Amino acid sequence: MPTSIELSPEMMRAIIMDHYSSPRNKRQPEGEGFVSTHSASVNCIDNIDVFLKMGDDGKVAEAYWDGVACAISTASTDIVCDLLVGKTEAEALYLLEQFTHMLHGEEYDPEPLDEALAFQNTYRQPNRIHCATIGWDALGELLKEHHHD
């Protein structure tokens, strides 16, 4: 049984629709020092680029995304960009891991997930899991690549 924090269906919808209709992190980054990757879905319209910049302190300084995506992918990717800023690489990877556990209906730590808890019932709709994880997975790859640089 998944661990969860109680959010009403209305609250979950409101969080998702807020980030879909007014994404805060959807833009091309300005300045230097960003790494990026492209991710697309064969089953949905999702076709995005994600951008990550690590600070000198080893924490995520900035995270953005740009492109075309469905409501689930847009909201989820926008939320993860918010959540990653200020996290160390280890904290960020832990966050990504907990989100993945949650989406697959496994035990997870809800503490770091914040607004991403709006996706806690996604495991009941397996066809939407990829939409919810496309941005998270891409940012996770960038974090892992940064670690090996």
Feature map (PLM): residue ranges:
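Structured beta-strand/loop patches that form or line metal/cofactor-binding pockets in enzymes
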Residues: 22-67
